[in-house]
């Protein structure tokens, strides 16, 4: 059964790689490295599909898994024939592309069915919630700071900053496709203003959630929860960060970037923290818009407008957020229950949450492929998304096998690695190649 799991997982990701390489082939035209890789991958996917279908009928106990893999194996040569017809006629390849996306989606759904119903758990004893002490915002470097300074730095949630800054930087790099030029002042001011805004939003979150934080092991040592920093001082600190952020962005960047940054702060500090997080299981999904906005902010800082590639990059992050955060929610579900937060694993259970992780990961990969098509990215972006995406997907597959909360935490880190690598690939495609 483990062999079948690995085979279907590999086939699913190979199909995704085939799709993004197909997009790159369409963009480059002719006999390019992307085209050669696409044709080689197409043959490999066909062999994997045949093997997966044969193994499904031999080993799988669930009829819909058998028929799902079989349907993909039947649909694949049909969409390949469409691709050959497009190649011969020189016509548009949208139907071929949609066929490939359909096969990928079918395989992902089939993999989810298989994992949910047929994979035997190996570590049920490890299914108790994984509780680490502390908030997760601290580090060895942070603890070297004087106590007073360290507490205020903790308020800003510094571990959120690197990925959000990388996202904004990728948005700025994407904007160069419009012909806009990057300059050092714009880059530095956008990132500095963004860091201050992230710090302000994090501080407001600490202030509002202080009572619930005291109930949770993970957050009980936060500065406001422990009264190490008073509510009034923390609020004033957050307001000060926001004011300086707005001044920097308006003065050194442009009003649109400043306005979008203000929207992001309100989205996180009010819409997510106050309205969504304590009231609905959809808090993570809808709240993902706050983390997606830096992509648009970065583009606006350079181009002075909002463009489709920036919106697609934001959509990648929006879809990635549930696939990312649900892993943490699984690992700390007992803690969230103590804090009276209706996180999905608390309300719907771990199995349902893992299914959602797979579906949102699939959506992330597809939107990332659409971004590559619109922005005209090549094999570097395609291979990065597929290879690191495979690593992310495999950690989720392992969760189904072990039901270990430590593996959920590993998936959380793998999701960070996926987005970070994807953003670096965007920088390489736009600034180097």
From Swiss-Prot:
Bilayer topology annotation: Multi-pass membrane protein
Annotated region (Unknown), positions in chain: 1-164
Protoheme IX prenyltransferase: region residues: 165-430
InterPro entries: Protohaem_IX_farnesylTrfase (IPR006369), UbiA_prenyltransferase (IPR000537), UbiA_sf (IPR044878)
EC code(s) of this entry: 2.5.1.141
UniProt-listed Pfam families: UbiA
Recorded GO MF terms: protoheme IX farnesyltransferase activity
Additional free-text comment from the UniProt record: Carbon 2 of the heme B porphyrin ring is defined according to the Fischer nomenclature.
Native organism taxonomy: Archaea, Methanobacteriati, Methanobacteriota, Stenosarchaea group, Halobacteria
First-level EC class: transferase
Protein name per its UniProtKB record: Protoheme IX farnesyltransferase 2
Top-level taxon: Archaea
Similarity comment: family membership: In the C-terminal section; belongs to the UbiA prenyltransferase family. Protoheme IX farnesyltransferase subfamily.
Pathway participation: Porphyrin-containing compound metabolism; heme O biosynthesis; heme O from protoheme: step 1/1
GO CC terms in record: plasma membrane
CDD domains with a match to the protein in the record: PT_UbiA_Cox10
